[in-house]
Structures are given as C-alpha cells and as structure tokens.
Amino acid sequence: GGLLKKARELAILCDAQLGVIIFSSSGKMFEFSSPPISMREIIDRYQKLSGNCAPVYDNQQVYCEITRMKNEIDKLQATMRHFAGEDLTSLTMNEMLQLEQQLEISVNKVRSRKEQLLQQQLDNLRRKENMLEEQNRELYRVIQDHHAASMEQKMVDPSMLDHFGVFYQDDHQAARSSMLQLSPQLHPFRLQPAQPNLQDANLLPHDLQL
C-alpha cells in the first residue's frame, strides 16, 4: 500500500509515466500505472524502446501456415492409403508406376530385414546347439568316469585271489579225501572151479543128483 502511494506521488511530482508491478509473498499481484496510460501501454513502450519486442503474427500468415500443415497431413494420409492399396482410382499411370516402385523398394527392405532376423535366430540356435553338445559331452565324460570308478571298486586284487585260491585247493583236497574214506571197500571176488564148496554134492538140489 505504501509503495503504491509513493509511486503515485512520484508520478505527480515528476510528471512522469510510471508503472509498478508488485508480487506479494502469498503470490498476489499488485500493479500501478500513472494515468492516463495503462500498464499494457507502458509494457509495449518498454519493449519497443529496449528491443525486446515479442513477435507479432499477422492473422493471414497464421492462416496460411495452418493451411499448409493441413495439406501436408492430407497428402501423407493419402500416401498411406495408397500404400495400403486404397483410393487407387484417383492415381494416374505415372503415379501408379511410382507407387509400384516405392512398394518394391519397401518390400526389398522388409525382406532384407526379415532375412537379417532369421539369420540372427539361426545363429542363436547354433550357439544353443553347441552349448547342448558341450554339456552332453561333459555329462558323458562324468558318466564314464563314474562307471570306471565303480568297476575298479568291484575288481579284486590278484594277490588276494591267489591267497583265497590256496584255501580253496586245500578244502577241495580235504573233501576228496573224506569221500574216499567213506566209500565202501570193494574187493574183487573170483570164482575158482577147484573150490570144494562148489563141488559138494550136498549143495546141489536133489533133483539134479546123478
């Protein structure tokens, strides 16, 4: 309040055109311009004299710029429809040839990009295949090592086999001796014609006596 009062007094005493803009700590704005001019006129005069004039656009210039941008957008949309195979009846022969060439160029670019992606996928699959083969070989090696270790554990030391072989031979001989002792003693029995018992008549049946 006091500052604006001082501004009024200064404008009257100095017969000057004065403009004051104040922003309080709460964000409120206060302004004063010495009559009969307004704050807008003071700001415009300041910009002209200081060279900080804001660009002023003519309405016709703005309209022309908007029209140009709209035409550009319409042309781009029409081109997109032509690439999609739409609204082709409005095209001339030369425009159709140009469109065909552009489509061929686009197709070649798409095909090249597709082949590039396929090659990348193929390279990735080959790398995965090599990794799987390496893992398979490593797993096979581990299995072979484990199998060899198991076979070594099952094998017996040859010196131990010789030691057990002596006991086996002794037991076999002992069993054989026992079988010989238990078998009956068979003596040969020979018939002697001169033996008296074979010539004793009493031993013959009565019906065979002469």
UniProtKB/Swiss-Prot annotation:
It comes from the Eukaryota. GO terms for molecular function: DNA binding; DNA-binding transcription factor activity; protein dimerization activity. Expressed exclusively in the carpel. Gene3D superfamilies: Transcription factor, MADS-box. Disulfide bonds: none annotated. Probable transcription factor. This is MADS-box protein AeAP3-2. It comes from Asarum europaeum (Asarabacca). The gene is AP3-2.
